[in-house]
Amino acid sequence: MVSLEKNDHLMLARQLPLKSVALILAGGRGTRLKDLTNKRAKPAVHFGGKFRIIDFALSNCINSGIRRMGVITQYQSHTLVQHIQRGWSFFNEEMNEFVDLLPAQQRMKGENWYRGTADAVTQNLDIIRRYKAEYVVILAGDHIYKQDYSHMLIDHVEKGARCTVACMPVPIEEASAFGVMAVDENDKIIEFVEKPANPPSMPNDPSKSLASMGIYVFDADYLYELLEEDDRDENSSHDFGKDLIPKITEAGLAYAHPFPLSCVQSDPDAEPYWRDVGTLEAYWKANLDLASVVPELDMYDRNWPIRTYNESLPPAKFVQDRSGSHGMTLNSLVSGGCVISGSVVVQSVLFSRVRVNSFCNIDSAVLLPEVWVGRSCRLRRCVIDRACVIPEGMVIGENAEEDARRFYRSEEGIVLVTREMLRKLGHKQER
């Protein structure tokens, strides 16, 4: 354990990110989002009115001072690759800044896909080694949060760790979806179990478990050595949570980093914000929260901007229809290029180029880009996928049986509508 003075912290906050490379695991399918990920990887799913989910991990890197990034892709990667090429191509390679796209290399005979999260890094080791980084930050590309990775890097160095795992308490009934750990008084991880059926509780709070967030910092040389050993192990599933972290824990070289120490928040008294929007309800709820009066996630912090591809679009427009009814919204996010004509939009999120025609009522809905809503529609508690054409007079979210017959309806009553579902009902999707 190394004790650092305040000036040392400031120096390390500048230096450590420059000595690091971030690898963002962005190949996940996200099957729990159902048809929303049929044609795009989960990190490429739209979020918050104008962003993609991966923009949060990428923006965290830039804001933390990390300007060398590799995005590891796999499932349905075209949309993700296109987004990064369009929105994240401003780096200066002469200044050693870049975002590298790293698809599956098929280096294992007979293997076309990554065998696990660790194998996704292993297959790109020859490229990653060329970065000559001292530290490697491993990130998931499908979570919504704001974090200063420089604080986690300082914690890693100060504790003398070879591997540091970001963690946060979660309700014990939800902990089976995470890696769960126990730590000593110095935050050394003394036990780690991946997705246990009966998760252990925290000693000071029986209602919570200490969960891994899938965010890791490694000494680079140590990581490369581990990955090569794991690659030779025929009994390994080649996964960080299932194989590598338990092995490092057993060797006594893994430390925990409490997320509140590096979470970026405008309100220091607020609960640290981190969301896995992996289910339809979680995705819908996280989007709608941004439209609330005081959202849990501050998207207006000029000191920690979330960057994305910005298409040149006109401002949103609210107009009256021919009968004189005004287009109006309340507690909603409405992006550029939208036109609301003589309709009411309440507690909803409308992405770019959405058109809502006259006499509609939109309530608690998420409408992805280029959705076209015909006249006299009522949409409630739903997610409408990109470029859907909702026919005149359609009602969604008011009749559970009808919704389940026509579309996908979750157990919580959130309805997902896609172009393919509408086509099967005989509704043309071309305008």
Curated annotation (Swiss-Prot):
Origin superkingdom: Bacteria
Residues the record lists as binding beta-D-fructose 1,6-bisphosphate: 39, 419-423, 429-431
EC number: 2.7.7.27
PROSITE patterns associated with the record: ADP_GLC_PYROPHOSPH_1, ADP_GLC_PYROPHOSPH_2, ADP_GLC_PYROPHOSPH_3
Regulation: Allosterically activated by fructose-1,6-bisphosphate (F16BP) and inhibited by AMP.
Gene Ontology biological process terms, A to Z: glycogen biosynthetic process
Catalytic activity: alpha-D-glucose 1-phosphate + ATP + H(+) = ADP-alpha-D-glucose + diphosphate
Name of one Pfam family that matches: NTP_transferase
Residues annotated for AMP binding in this entry: 40, 46, 52, 130, 370, 386
Residues engaged in binding alpha-D-glucose 1-phosphate: 114, 179, 194-195, 212
InterPro entries assigned: ADP-Glc_PPase, ADP_Glu_pyroP_CS, GlgC_bac, GlmU/GlgC-like_hexapep, NTP_transferase_dom, Nucleotide-diphossugar_trans, Trimer_LpxA-like_sf
Protein family per UniProt: Belongs to the bacterial/plant glucose-1-phosphate adenylyltransferase family.
Record's function text: Involved in the biosynthesis of ADP-glucose, a building block required for the elongation reactions to produce glycogen. Catalyzes the reaction between ATP and alpha-D-glucose 1-phosphate (G1P) to produce pyrophosphate and ADP-Glc.
Subunit text: Homotetramer.
Name under which the protein is recorded: Glucose-1-phosphate adenylyltransferase
Species per Swiss-Prot/TrEMBL record: Escherichia coli O127:H6 (strain E2348/69 / EPEC)
Gene coding for it: glgC
